[in-house]
Amino acid sequence: MEEAYRQARKRGEQGRRRAISQSEHPYLTDLDSLVAQLPLGQRENVGLRDIPLEMVVGTVTKGRQSAFSCNFMPLLPFSTEFARKWSNLYDIQVTEGYRDPVIVTEFMHRFYVQEGNKRVSVLKFLDAPTVSAKVTRLYPGTWDSVESRLYGEFCAFWRVCPLYEIEFSREGSYETLAKMLGQNLIEKWPQKKVDYLRHTFLLFKRAYLRAGGDHLDITPANAMLVYLNVYNQDRLLDTPTDIVVNRLCKIWRELVIAGKNDEDKVDLVEAPSVDEEETPAKSTSGVLNFFMGKTVYSTANPLRIAFIHEFPCATSSWDSLHDQGRQYLDEHFGGIVRTEAFEDCHDPDVFYAAVETAVKHGANVIFSTSHRLMEYTLRAAVEYPRIRFLNCSIGLPHQSVRSYFGKMYEAKFLLGALAASMADNHRIGYHASVFASGALSEINAFAIGASLLDPRAQIILTWGDVPAGGLAEAMCREGVSVMTGADMSKSLEDPTAYGLHRLVDGKVTGIAMPVWNWGRYYELIVKSLLHGTWDETSDDNQVRAVNYWYGMSSGVIDIRYAPGLPYQTRKLVQLLRNGIVEGSINPFGGELHSQNGVVQIEGFPPLPSTQIVEMNWLADNVVGTIPQLDDEPKVPAL
């Protein structure tokens, strides 16, 4: 009895000294002081629950605060009555166990003891996982902070699946987890599903800590989501711990990125690493001589690249354009680069079979050309770490897979100016098929471009899929005379779904369209591999995702005019285009206004690229709203 208390007190002193050395509070936090200056909401009687002891972090009142170290271990000498009571409780616990629950208040997913501090201390000393407690939940008075919103999401999760152990640090994660398990946050989960999640999480947590997860800046629940995103088809309960640990080691860099702040997760690479003028086409000595001595690849040992398309190129204009870019590589690099394509790989089994075939054929690089293939691509990249994987998307923070996409907002800015110069009544239609990463920046750039030529211009925004031929009719009903569709039509059934058009007397006339030059994009990425500058893009000491985000200045984005466009109009747009290419014009520089007010005032520099990618507002001359999102990850607009 005395020896146990002395050991516990020693741990308490160690915890107290450690806290002081780290400029932290050395004693228990008391809830009364914590919430004294905070707006508080109602209290709810949660009832009798088994709660995780690691989440019991303090006491309700200040009275017993200094009797315990911040780790809940005792600090008072053994000669005190406090020590004798602690020791008696220790004896009861190791001989027969406690029968009475402690009384706690839950606040922001942590527990503070009102009655039973010494019992909690004893159980923590014995490394017990849980304690029986009567719980009263204290809600925050406001929900406008990230922390309170996260707690609100936890409460919604807890009502349908009462597990305290599951704690996320990123908004939307509880709904993501629910969807992975075929559930939601509205209907109560079957008890079998709750038990399954509890056992699965505890198994994963043991493996995660065994792999060294306590050194990472993410919760075990966050790490489990990352794991399931890669190995989502495997039941954790059926997987030996050694295999789970080995898999965690394979995705370690993904876990490191998951623990970073959003602004530290992704490196946006906006300029090619190889000088644009230094191209084989401009070398008088030919392609082979141009790369002689600059690369380890040759016609005898080519750089082998596989392209995996989501749909058949014959029916998907998006995949067809990417495949034209692939063919351009074969022609452009004169045998130093050899490619092969795999089509219609939207099914996971077909995708993984394509990867296996590409690996057998000696592929050094694999491109997957749709954001919807990222999940499969990530798992393949983890399984084949020596192969370089890239996915056509933007803003997705994966270290194992690099992303690439274009600054389509630059082209939309020009199309907006062009639309305003030709609109009859200040009303311009804009149709977006999906709410995606980059979609709002494209809408806003279009609206800003239109406002430069016509301050009274209104952008009539619509969303969603429209039947073939129906977009023009829908826009006519809105009273617009000029309209634009998506960046890329999925098929040729409805030409008005793509590009900028005039609507006059029921007739649709093309004006201009955005252009993707995927051949040029792939050329720039491949040149970084041939020249050996691929690894210069990222710092191995700084684990970050790499997203290529090239625009007009790199030649990967442009616009194409319809025949017969007045030369004065072309000249105007060309002036704006030159400004974008040279960097003297940026749609998101200077004064900006949203539907809710001023975004930034005159004289401010352009918005950072990360804010453009993750834009969450609409310009003040847009008539429309942002759709309500479910928890599906945002994807680039196609």
What is each residue range found by the language model?
Residues 382-405:
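Flexible loop/hinge segments that line or gate small-molecule binding clefts
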Residues 531-537, 541-638:
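Segments of small-molecule ligand-sensing domains
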Residues 305-324, 329, 342-348, 436-440:
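Extracytoplasmic "Venus flytrap"
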Residues 362-371, 390-392, 480-489, 508-516, ...:
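Periplasmic-binding protein-like
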Residues 404-426, 515-536:
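Hydrophobic alpha-helical segments within soluble ligand-binding/sensing domains
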Residues 1-118, 124-125, 170-183, 190, ...:
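Short, charged/polar connector segments at secondary-structure boundaries
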Residues 107, 114-177:
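Glycine- and acidic-residue-rich phosphate-binding/metal-coordinating active-site segment common to enzymes
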Residues 326, 414-457, 540-563:
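An alpha-beta-alpha
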